[in-house]
Amino acid sequence: MIGRIQGTLVSVHPPRLLVDCQGVGYEIDVPMSTLYQLPEVNQKITLLTHFQVREDAQQLFGFATEIEREAFRQLIKISGVGSRTALAVLSGMSVNELAQAIALQEAGRLTQVPGIGKKTAERLCLELKGKLAPDLGITGGKPQAIEATSEVLQALLSLGYSEKEALLALKQIPPETSVSDGIRMGLKYLSKP
């Protein structure tokens, strides 16, 4: 198995890179989050990789961080989620956003990713629940904190704020905040001009 590639970045044609490693050019598919962290062409690059062998193809997938690679590996374990879909998920949201959506069972956030329908999003929430955050070392929070965050989100939505506004406000609230303090802080943030 190929676990890491270090070489010179030759070309970028999203989502594919060409990396020269001692005279051998490796085509590597990467999520958008990794593309944003790339150096300039002809610069040195190191990518963590996942090597996939199927009966009709051998593919390399590259990631800037171990957390991204592990999230990819968790995603492709799910029935009906292939490597392309897993890359689309990691391109559409950060690993922390994915872990939070799974922890809060927010299938609606996952359907915003191109190629992810309602059934697939629900399957992701069901099958990754309790797996993603602990495996990746992501602090999804204690169950009480997750419950409080969900209640704050619901309160802001019921007050007429859009999901986008409510999620922006949630990012400003510390994870261990109580529901009432979270709502107060969220409203204060949203009332700023």
Swiss-Prot record:
GO terms for cellular component: cytoplasm; Holliday junction helicase complex; Holliday junction resolvase complex. InterPro entries: DNA_helicase_Holl-junc_RuvA_I (IPR013849), Hlx-hairpin-Hlx_DNA-bd_motif (IPR003583), NA-bd_OB-fold (IPR012340), RuvA (IPR000085), RuvA_2-like (IPR010994), RuvA_C (IPR011114), RuvA_C_sf (IPR036267). Keywords: Cytoplasm, DNA damage, DNA recombination, DNA repair, DNA-binding. CDD domains: UBA_RuvA_C. The keyword Ion transport does not apply. SUPFAM superfamilies: DNA helicase RuvA subunit, C-terminal domain (SSF46929), Nucleic acid-binding proteins (SSF50249), RuvA domain 2-like (SSF47781). GO terms for biological process: DNA recombination; DNA repair. It holds the Pfam family RuvA_N. Residues 144-193 are annotated as: Domain III. Residues 139-143 are annotated as: Flexible linker. Residues 65-139 are annotated as: Domain II. Its main location: cytoplasm. GO terms for molecular function: ATP binding; four-way junction DNA binding; four-way junction helicase activity. Residues 1-64 are annotated as: Domain I. The keyword DNA damage applies. It is found in: Cytoplasm. The RuvA-RuvB-RuvC complex processes Holliday junction (HJ) DNA during genetic recombination and DNA repair, while the RuvA-RuvB complex plays an important role in the rescue of blocked DNA replication forks via replication fork reversal (RFR). RuvA specifically binds to HJ cruciform DNA, conferring on it an open structure. The RuvB hexamer acts as an ATP-dependent pump, pulling dsDNA into and through the RuvAB complex. HJ branch migration allows RuvC to scan DNA until it finds its consensus sequence, where it cleaves and resolves the cruciform DNA. Homotetramer. Forms an RuvA(8)-RuvB(12)-Holliday junction (HJ) complex. HJ DNA is sandwiched between 2 RuvA tetramers; dsDNA enters through RuvA and exits via RuvB. An RuvB hexamer assembles on each DNA strand where it exits the tetramer. Each RuvB hexamer is contacted by two RuvA subunits (via domain III) on 2 adjacent RuvB subunits; this complex drives branch migration. In the full resolvosome a probable DNA-RuvA(4)-RuvB(12)-RuvC(2) complex forms which resolves the HJ. Belongs to the RuvA family. Has three domains with a flexible linker between the domains II and III and assumes an 'L' shape. Domain III is highly mobile and contacts RuvB. NCBIfam families: ruvA. This is Holliday junction branch migration complex subunit RuvA. The lineage of its organism: Bacteria, Pseudomonadati, Pseudomonadota, Betaproteobacteria, Burkholderiales. The gene is ruvA.
